[in-house]
Amino acid sequence: MTTLAIDIGGTKLAAALIDKNLRISQRRELPTPASKTPDALREALKALVEPLRAEARQVAIASTGIIQEGMLLALNPHNLGGLLHFPLVQTLETIAGLPTLAVNDAQAAAWAEYHALPDDIRDMVFITVSTGVGGGVVCDGKLLTGKGGLAGHLGHTLADPHGPVCGCGRVGCVEAIASGRGMAAAARDDLAGCDAKTLFIRAGEGHQQARHLVSQSAQVIARMIADVKATTDCQCVVIGGSVGLAEGYLEQVRAFLMQEPVPYHVALSAARYRHDAGLLGAALLAQGDTL
């Protein structure tokens, strides 16, 4: 059965057709609407899906935010242009005319990456560092979503009680410091207004402030991983996202994690499916894997 998989992120929307063997075809991307209206997201999704829907039998959505009974509830509304409450499943069922499943993007990615690991791995955590910071937890071979869909939102754990205010309302969240948006917000002087991609370029050129911002992000993520190891005793952690997969970033996270006491060490690896993990995980779930 062919699935129309959709990935809704803070900066881009992606869609593709995925067959029963998880082969991806006709991948398309559009920027996430900058305007803060449900209509803008609805129209963007319609434009994304329209060329693909005739060849699909079902829709699977991986989206940033909390998915609760088919509704998209943004824990940090800034990551989706201010959206607080959006009828995601209903909207796609109307646009595509197909049965639709929705799950958090990091949870979906965790499920895809879990299936790529050796069979003896039963406990793993996926972390995405991108516009925001998210996560997905697989425990004893089962994906944890939580009754309210909140499970795995690791970016909203505490990094610095005196840090910046996060879009979720807490002070000093991991996401507020380590995410691409958090790094950009902290940039000053000649880096003010730069996005995360530019900060990585400048860091590679030796710019002191840019190097500090990247290093600070990596250290915050490493400390969060130590907390995750203490909480879940996971066998491995897989890292994805545009920041997480940036050149040299994983190596910095690994170096900072090695500075933590030995019980908190855990194997780290880059996402095998890279930017397609959310699409593939959602398709896996729609094709019969249960939450």
Curated annotation (Swiss-Prot):
ATP binds at residues 5-12, 132-139. Transmembrane segments: none annotated. Pathway: Amino-sugar metabolism; N-acetylneuraminate degradation; D-fructose 6-phosphate from N-acetylneuraminate: step 2/5. Its EC number is 2.7.1.60. It is an enzyme of class 2 (transferase). GO terms for biological process: N-acetylneuraminate catabolic process. Pfam families: ROK. Zn(2+) binds at residues 156, 166, 168, 173. Keywords: ATP-binding, Carbohydrate metabolism, Kinase, Metal-binding, Nucleotide-binding, Transferase, Zinc. It catalyses: an N-acyl-D-mannosamine + ATP = an N-acyl-D-mannosamine 6-phosphate + ADP + H(+). It comes from the Bacteria. One of its GO terms (molecular function) is zinc ion binding. NCBIfam families: NactlManKinNanK, PRK05082.1. Belongs to the ROK (NagC/XylR) family. NanK subfamily. Catalyzes the phosphorylation of N-acetylmannosamine (ManNAc) to ManNAc-6-P. Homodimer. This is N-acetylmannosamine kinase.
